[in-house]
Amino acid sequence: MMKPTFLRWVAIAALMAGGTFTVAANPPAAPPVSYGVEEDVFHPVRATHGMVASVDALATQVGVDILKQGGNAVDAAVAVGYALAVTHPQAGNLGGGGFMMLRTKDGKTTAIDFREMAPNQASRDMFLDDQGNPDSKKSLTSHLASGTPGTVAGFSLALEKYGTLPLNKVVQPAIKLARDGFVVNDALADDLKTYGSEVIPNHENSKAIFWKDGEPLKKGDKLVQKDLAKSLELIAENGPDAFYKGPIADQIADEMQKNGGLITKADLAEYKAVEREPISGTYRGYEVFSMPPPSSGGIHIVQILNILENFDMHKFGFGSADAMQVMAEAEKRAYADRSEYLGYPDFVKVPWQALTNKAYAKSIADEIDINKAKPSSEIRPGKLAPYESNQTTHFSVVDKDGNAVAVTYTLNTTFGTGIVAGNSGILLNNEMDDFSAKPGVPNVYGLVGGDANAVGPKKRPLSSMSPTIVVKDGKTWLVTGSPGGSRIITTVLQMVVNSIDFGMNVAEATNAPRFHHQWLPDELRVEKGFSPDTLKLLEQRGQKVAVKEAMGSTQSIMVGPDGALFGASDPRSVDDLTAGY
């Protein structure tokens, strides 16, 4: 029987007033659950000295080579990030932004925010039409859609503070790939045909790079990017100033000025990547570190884990109706809170302490009825004291000393705006769509935002990107993350729960079918692979089940007690690779 809803409000009111709850101390981290079966269904890649997991085989090899040359995990991560800007242009980028989570061999965990920023001339209603309704063409495919890019600044900050190799060395592999070219693989060919065709043919600079004889490049064609190679050479020689104050800045600002965009040289010169304190929590004795705002991921992963801690997930079992019901109901509440409270922390007060408090989670858990789903129409954000495509991309790196890096970055939708800035070879993002063009109206991924995420100058839009590091007994245990827009949070959540509660190795946790609920729309989205009987049970309990396409593309590394590395790339993607030595 559900406890009265007002208990939740009492708990929240106390938190907002500065009150405290006595919460039982977390037990030491238990070993992952064992089912007494020795044989694994899926086998991870194994290495001892270093490992890289990314969506592209060429980029993964670049990272492994940097590790072999004596670079640490940060050096390798930056090299992979620049390489993906060449080999995976649908999401890898210089003209976008993202987040990095890193944990040093000494146990320091930190977050680097290089999310795009709204230009100084941005205004709250800039994406509304004459009738006051959101105009997706403005926020997705026009020059107005681009925020000031952060990738180059973020990589530079990470390398300067935590790397060991010079920028010139880690950028060289990307320069070579851009200058000499590489063979187009299945993933790029398919995305150019499916998504690129919607935006790239509208812009001659872009078409000249990715089209041949009037058609998108096909598998087996060679992609050479001479202009991008020159831009990378400028960055290698002159550092981030080449991008934010030098000739690349000139190209971007000129492209904007000629086509009605807002980014100016002043916007570029003022951009700074920011190092932030990670969001942290505990789950059954494991420590969980993830991104703080402007990512909503860290807060809500911890929030949902806190709710699940009140249930015996291991006893329920993976793929059971009970486990899926509890997780779906927890996800609904978290996404409702997201819509109300999450935004850019430099502009709005984000009540992260209340949202991640275990007493608040207990009040939510007490409301969940395992036998009856609560309609989303009856769920409101807690009275506390809120969007990327599948072509966001994530990569993970761990080195021989135990340094670990998780990076998720993006252009937003596939190939961003499709606009290449002048002769820079750099595709520009359409990240401005991640703001709430009109609070209460869903964005391109169906996510609803409030006033906290409204458009405003110098603001960074809310994101679901959730690079995450899990620590066991003081040592890095799992490094993970995923693309997937609104489904990033639940994809990463299931990697953690599959590993801890259901005793899966990293490959099994990656391969397991996934599900997702984001409050609105009121739909439990599931991949193929769950028992039809289970889905019928969920429908009988009030869930509106819909079998949909694959979700996410995790790139994960697990560290064994002896330091051995076990990695897995997601089979939902093609041409990705986990490798080590």
Predicted ranges, named:
Residues 1-11:
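Bacterial N-terminal signal peptides that target proteins for export
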Residues 10-20:
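Bacterial N-terminal signal peptides
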Residues 26-61, 73-74, 78-238, 243-245, ...:
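Noncatalytic scaffold domains of N-terminal-nucleophile
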Residues 66-67, 153-161, 238-245, 250, ...:
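Alpha-helical support elements that line or immediately flank enzyme active sites
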Residues 86-111, 262-264, 404-472, 502, ...:
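Active-site rim segments in enzyme catalytic domains, especially the processed small/beta chain
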Residues 275, 389-392, 414, 463-465:
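Short, small/polar residue-rich loop motifs at catalytic or cofactor-binding pockets
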Residues 311-411, 423-424, 439-440, 448:
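Internal maturation/activation junctions in enzymes
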Residues 438, 459, 492, 501-549:
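Extended C-terminal subregions enriched in glycine
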